[in-house]
Regions:
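General small-molecule cofactor/ligand-binding pocket signal
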Residues: 53, 97, 158
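Short, well-structured N-terminal submotif of metal-dependent ribonuclease cores
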Residues: 1-59, 69-82, 155
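C-terminal binding/interaction regions
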Residues: 135-137, 145-158
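Active-site neighborhoods of divalent-metal-dependent phosphate/nucleic-acid chemistry enzymes
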Residues: 2-12, 93-145
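Residues that scaffold the ATP/ADP-binding catalytic core of kinase and kinase-like folds
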Residues: 33-35, 65, 149
Length: 158
């Protein structure tokens, strides 16, 4: 999930198939890019103003990425604590969606651009289960598979 990421994006760079969005869905790769990689566009999208949604999966994956960074020697213990505090602040500002049975059922069905890994499918299914029209949602991601599917499903991508 934390592989190669696209260049930093700004609001004006958001790929929007049908107008402006009213809230953002934060996918794990964007949160990790904001907190660990210094991606200014991701940081603005993740920590800036506005309404945000995320899956509980987003915060589990992000916390694991922080732990891996410390274990790999990229962070010391104090750096890990600082980033985890920032992650908790992001989580507190989000409406967090549980990984529910309907999300898992949707994740098990095909998406427009296959193959899709299971965790990516859970993110995409979570967005769909929010029940909003795609024109109202921007998906914030640095993951190519999420980006391709989000655009194919009619969502704006940042």
């Amino acid at each position: 999930m934390v592989g190669k990421r696209a260049r930093a994006r700004t609001d004006k760079d958001a790929e929007t198939p049908a107008g402006g969005a009213s809230f953002r869905y934060l996918e794990s790769s964007a949160v990790v890019a904001a907190l660990l990689d210094g991606d200014a566009g991701a940081r603005h999208a993740v920590e800036g103003e506005g309404q945000r949604f995320a899956s509980a999966l987003t915060f589990a994956e992000s916390a694991r990425a922080v732990l891996r960074a410390r274990l790999a020697g990229h962070l010391d213990l104090n750096g890990e604590r600082t980033i985890l505090r920032r992650l908790r602040r992001v989580e507190q500002r989000c409406q967090v969606a549980a990984i529910s049975d309907p999300v898992l059922a949707r994740a098990s069905r095909p998406f427009p651009v296959e193959p899709v890994r299971t965790l990516d499918a859970i993110h995409l299914a979570t967005v769909e289960e929010l029940g909003e029209t795609p024109q109202l949602i921007t998906i914030v991601t640095r993951d190519r598979r999420i980006r391709e599917n989000a655009l194919a499903m009619g969502y704006a991508v940042e």
